[in-house]
């Protein structure tokens, strides 16, 4: 069931290097396609260095860096927060001060109509529930394992697999 707030967990069969062991938070899903951001790819660019004093740094939890949101529109900066239990884009020009805590992403992941559904049917993604803590985690490098470990069934077992299966 695809809808806003779900997480896409990259399966090992997904051949795109942009998405190896990634978690994508879906922000928008409609008949035209889907849009999301990668939650576990922090960059070394600090929010303060990128935006100066234009953003209240306290609203961006540690690590206070820009995240690589995906391969599309890498020159686009998106703010993402949770509002009423669902992820929402933050208007960085006008209303970021009322958004509460949020993350900043350079770029995003996008799919055309039916493209994501086809990738899921092909086994490229697992779809699992997401939560605000996933977006705001202070340990994004561990998030892929943490999200998998809280699932049930075989998907939980995947959290213990090494990046290179030959190291198993």
Which residues make up each language-model segment?
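A short aromatic-anchored loop/beta-hairpin motif
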Residues: 1-168
């Amino acid at each position: 069931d695809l809808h806003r707030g779900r997480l896409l967990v990259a399966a090992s069969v997904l051949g795109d290097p942009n998405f190896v062991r990634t978690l994508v938070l879906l922000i928008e899903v409609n008949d035209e396609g889907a849009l999301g951001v990668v939650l576990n790819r922090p960059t070394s660019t600090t929010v303060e260095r990128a935006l100066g004093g234009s953003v209240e740094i306290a609203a961006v939890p540690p690590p206070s860096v820009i995240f690589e949101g995906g391969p599309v529109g890498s020159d686009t900066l998106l703010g993402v927060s949770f509002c009423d239990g669902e992820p929402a884009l933050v208007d960085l020009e006008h209303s970021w001060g009322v958004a509460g805590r949020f993350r900043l992403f350079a770029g995003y992941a996008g799919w055309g109509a039916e493209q994501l559904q086809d990738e899921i049917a092909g086994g490229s993604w697992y779809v699992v529930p997401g939560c605000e803590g996933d977006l705001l985690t202070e340990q994004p490098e561990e998030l892929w394992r943490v999200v998998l470990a809280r699932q049930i069934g075989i998907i939980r077992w995947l959290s213990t697999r090494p990046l290179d299966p030959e190291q198993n």
